[in-house]
Structure formats: structure tokens, C-alpha cells
Regions:
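Non-heme di-metal
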Residues: 1-91
């Protein structure tokens, strides 16, 4: 991991981490649906549990960034992925 030297770099790194978490959840959802389609229900439940934990991580990062007053309004990818994740979890 590249060393972070400034507060600005740190905030960018946190945004990247949030986006990575959201992408991971979306990928887990695709895997979950594929497993269910193949009647692999036990395996799908494991993936659902992992995705749920990833969602908790994403929420923690989201809240942290909001508490730090980081402006996410110019990060359309994050907002789009966040809306997708909320749909996945029926929020």
C-alpha cells in the first residue's frame, strides 16, 4: 500500500475504500444470484453473510466520511453504487 502523506490523500484513499466495498457487495450479489439459480442454497447463504459484513464496512466508511465532512456529491460512481447496494439490501 502506498503511504498517505496528506489529509487530502487520506480522504481520497477513504473514498476509494468505500467504492471498493460497494463494488464488492455488488459482485457478491451477482455471485449469490448465480448460486441460487444453480440451487446451491447453502453456498448462497454463505455469500449473503459475507456481503452483509461488507455492507457493515461500507456503512462505517460512509458514516466516517460524512462525519469528516467529506463532500461526496461530486462522486457519482459512489452514489450510483450506493443506490445499487441499497436496492440489494431492500433499503
Amino acid at each position: 500500500m502506498k503511504a498517505v502523506h496528506t489529509e487530502s490523500e487520506l480522504m481520497e484513499k477513504l473514498k476509494e475504500e468505500l467504492e471498493d466495498e460497494l463494488e464488492g457487495i455488488i459482485e457478491y450479489d451477482h455471485l449469490y444470484n448465480a448460486l441460487k439459480a444453480h440451487k446451491m442454497h447453502k453456498e448462497a447463504m454463505v455469500i449473503e453473510s459475507i456481503a452483509s459484513n461488507e455492507y457493515k464496512h461500507a456503512c462505517a466508511l460512509w458514516d466516517m466520511l460524512k462525519d469528516l465532512d467529506v463532500d461526496l456529491s461530486d462522486h457519482e460512481d459512489i452514489h450510483t453504487k450506493w443506490e445499487t447496494v441499497k436496492t440489494i439490501f431492500n433499503i
